[in-house]
Amino acid sequence: MTWRERAELRIGISGMPGVGKTTLVLKIAELARSRVKVCGFVTVEVREGGTRIGFDVVDLANGRRMALARVGRGEPSVGKYVVNLEACNVISEALRRECDLKIIDEIGAMEFKCKNFGEDLQTALHTSPRVIATVHRNYIDIAKKLGLEIIWLTRENWGLVFRQLLIQLGLTQ
């Protein structure tokens, strides 16, 4: 079965911090790029001297990177992080872009601080043929209501989940 013959796919990857959710979607995006148009965004940790100081958002279509959150005081905030609302533009543009495989990393509290995130997310899920999203464990119920099939990722099942997703996406030889 070719990529084009694959049915629509809506997968949400959730799990505890550090199990490799972002790594998983980045590897899938990397493999898919040679066959199809990939878009969306990832949220990557920013570390200084081994300590996490925040997160950047990266648009997968054009590589645009912007600070999403940093340790500090101010509003809006999520835990010890202050969210940079200017980064919401990167997220919004990534969600609105048309492509064959959309990566959304992540559906979580920081992203929902963006005014249009919920609306842009719903539009992306209804208009994109294939979506793989990472989902913060506190947002699983919301993700299910949006139509995502949730897979719980662990360090132990990472390889199996990766292979299953490659098969579902038609990315295996």
Curated annotation (Swiss-Prot):
Binding-site residues, ATP: 15-22, 101-108
Highest rank taxon of the organism: Archaea
GO terms, molecular function: ATP binding; ATP hydrolysis activity
UniProt EC number: 3.6.1.15
Substrates-to-products reaction catalysed: a ribonucleoside 5'-triphosphate + H2O = a ribonucleoside 5'-diphosphate + phosphate + H(+)
Keyword line: ATP-binding, Hydrolase, Nucleotide-binding
HAMAP family, per database record: NTPase_1 (MF_00796)
Function: Has nucleotide phosphatase activity towards ATP, GTP, CTP, TTP and UTP. May hydrolyze nucleoside diphosphates with lower efficiency.
Family: Belongs to the THEP1 NTPase family.
Name of this protein: Nucleoside-triphosphatase THEP1
